[in-house]
Regions:
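Short tryptophan-centered beta-strand motifs in secreted/extracellular beta-sheet-rich domains
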Residues: 28-30, 84-98, 102-108
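Flexible glycan-contacting loops in extracellular carbohydrate-active proteins
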Residues: 115-147
Length: 156
């Protein structure tokens, strides 16, 4: 089954899913598909640790990915998204030491290609690891549907 967000009405739409897991590292995997319409492009986001937890947001119009925590931007990475193809995401959050810092890893690649060996992001941040549920958001700025598939949560 594929979870599809229609292109209208325009707005931001999200869902929390999976078990509330604390004190263990989490990996969220999923794939998504969407298209642009003229110069308008959709945006997607995924989170670990609930709505205010660690979030990645793909901003195709700005050609970047943004990692944020509790609405504070942590890192911006240049990224060129191509529409009309499935994309695969691996997003990991692992506590370090006494959970006072967190190691974050991220991969994003076209599904028709092999998974890259290197992580797009592999960095330690001074944010407290709390764990929690996972989240997905869709922002259909292009007025075209956004599809999510192959949702998988792994605990470490």
């Amino acid at each position: 089954k594929i979870l599809t967000l229609p292109g209208t009405p325009m707005g931001d739409f999200g869902l929390l899913f999976g078990p509330r897991i604390r004190e263990k590292g989490l990996e969220l995997r999923f794939s998504f598909f969407s298209t642009n319409k003229g110069r308008r492009m959709p945006s997607i986001a995924a989170g670990i640790g609930g709505i205010r937890g660690l979030q990645l947001r793909l901003n195709p119009a700005a050609r970047n990915l943004v990692l944020s925590y509790d609405e504070t931007n942590l890192k911006k990475v240049p990224f060129l998204w191509v529409d009309a193809q499935w994309w695969e995401v691996r997003f990991q959050m692992t506590p370090e030491g006494s959970c006072s810092s967190t190691n974050v890893k991220l991969k994003l690649w076209p599904l028709k290609e092999n998974e890259p060996r290197a992580w797009l992001v592999n960095e330690k941040f001074d944010i407290e690891y709390k764990g929690g549920k996972c989240a997905l958001w869709g922002f259909p700025y292009a007025s075209t549907p956004i599809a999510f598939d192959n949702l998988l949560i792994l605990s470490r």
